Amino acid sequence: MKIIDPYKRVEFLENALFEDIGYHKFIPYIQLHEFEALLLANPEILLMEYVTAHNQIEKLKEIVVNYDNNPEKVNTGNTTAPSKRIIALIPEYEGNKVSVGSVLAGIEGIEVQKGRCKHFADWINKIQNISEQSV
């Protein structure tokens, strides 16, 4: 069975993980495509590290718009994954994506990512609901 819709595919995998682990407090999360989708929720954050990349940031924003303005959908192949698109426009990102990407994504907090990345937001909301129930 091949699941075409990326959201349904990830949901299927997360449900399988949940059932396999079998622990009610385990909340699986598989990032839709890759971490850099969260950076594409607000590409302008990349300007904090790449201060002269204004034109490249505008191109990244256009890419997201072309995917229904949904950063989680930006991926149609090995060369078009979010990180590959960032690297194509900002080659310096390749050498420091692990350190820069995680720091930049965390600077704004998660509200921007939650607002633009449905799958990510659903997972965070599950965690927050459990946390609120525990209080």
Please name every model-derived segment.
Residues 1-135:
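C-terminal accessory helical subdomains adjacent to catalytic cores in phosphodiester-
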